[in-house]
Amino acid sequence: MSGHSKWHNIQGRKNAQDAKRGKIFQKLSREIYMAAKSGGPDPDGNPTLRMVIDKARSNNMPKDNIKRAIKKAEGGSEEHYDEITYEGYAPGGVAVFVEALTDNKNRTASDVRVAFTRNGGSLGATGSVAYMFDRKGYIVIDRSTTDADEDQVLLDVMDAGGDDLQTSDDAFEIYTDPKQFADVRDALIKDGYKLADAELTMIPQNTTPVPADKKEQFEHLVDALEDSDDVQNVYTAAADED
């Protein structure tokens, strides 16, 4: 692993998104609906649904909202969303990978294109930056919730089938092969760990510092993409701030 750490960035993004919680719930409902529709409504038999429900809970999504999305899928709704990705560069040459769930591809493509062009970025062709990212399972343990030291956590992670452990003052960050993600997550929970975050994500192989004079524009681009109702995830290769 390149040493790229996500946890502080995730915390910062979640804090910044408090004012957008309604939109976040809308996006999570869409993910839950599609996961339940494609893999069944029982999270015990549908790892994707379970992962999305865990993600919803970590964002304090009300239980009733989760149940409604699942019932909508059970009820045979004809509503359908396509999974689409977009790739490009932010100001300063930082690679950006966008995942969307949409019922109108033209609308989403237009929204994404406008976000890039109005904020100093450039939308690229399919495959232009995807190769710069690796799909990984990502799990976080808040150090304040466990008495285990780094050696013990590393042992448990390796026993569970995890690939890598990174530590900071406040968290243990675990990376897994995507196919092993659910097994590693379940094993760590069984070992008694409380997980602060658990998701499938995209990790940049290398990172690019955002130039000081491009930082505001870069942040505006990410915000514009995340403001789109259809965009589910925005991944960048921006270097962590010191």
Curated annotation (Swiss-Prot):
<dbReference type="Pfam" id="PF20772">
    <property type="entry name" value="TACO1_YebC_N"/>
</dbReference>
<dbReference type="GO" id="GO:0006355">
    <property type="term" value="P:regulation of DNA-templated transcription"/>
</dbReference>
<comment type="similarity">
    <text>Belongs to the TACO1 family.</text>
</comment>
<dbReference type="InterPro" id="IPR048300">
    <property type="entry name" value="TACO1_YebC-like_2nd/3rd_dom"/>
</dbReference>
<feature type="region of interest" description="Disordered">
    <location>
        <begin position="1"/>
        <end position="22"/>
    </location>
</feature>
<dbReference type="GO" id="GO:0003677">
    <property type="term" value="F:DNA binding"/>
</dbReference>
<keyword id="KW-0804">Transcription</keyword>
<dbReference type="InterPro" id="IPR049083">
    <property type="entry name" value="TACO1_YebC_N"/>
</dbReference>
<dbReference type="InterPro" id="IPR017856">
    <property type="entry name" value="Integrase-like_N"/>
</dbReference>
<dbReference type="InterPro" id="IPR026564">
    <property type="entry name" value="Transcrip_reg_TACO1-like_dom3"/>
</dbReference>
<protein>
    <recommendedName>
        <fullName>Probable transcriptional regulatory protein lhv_0777</fullName>
    </recommendedName>
</protein>
<keyword id="KW-0963">Cytoplasm</keyword>
<dbReference type="InterPro" id="IPR029072">
    <property type="entry name" value="YebC-like"/>
</dbReference>
<dbReference type="GO" id="GO:0005829">
    <property type="term" value="C:cytosol"/>
</dbReference>
<keyword id="KW-0805">Transcription regulation</keyword>
<dbReference type="InterPro" id="IPR002876">
    <property type="entry name" value="Transcrip_reg_TACO1-like"/>
</dbReference>
<dbReference type="Pfam" id="PF01709">
    <property type="entry name" value="Transcrip_reg"/>
</dbReference>
<keyword id="KW-0238">DNA-binding</keyword>
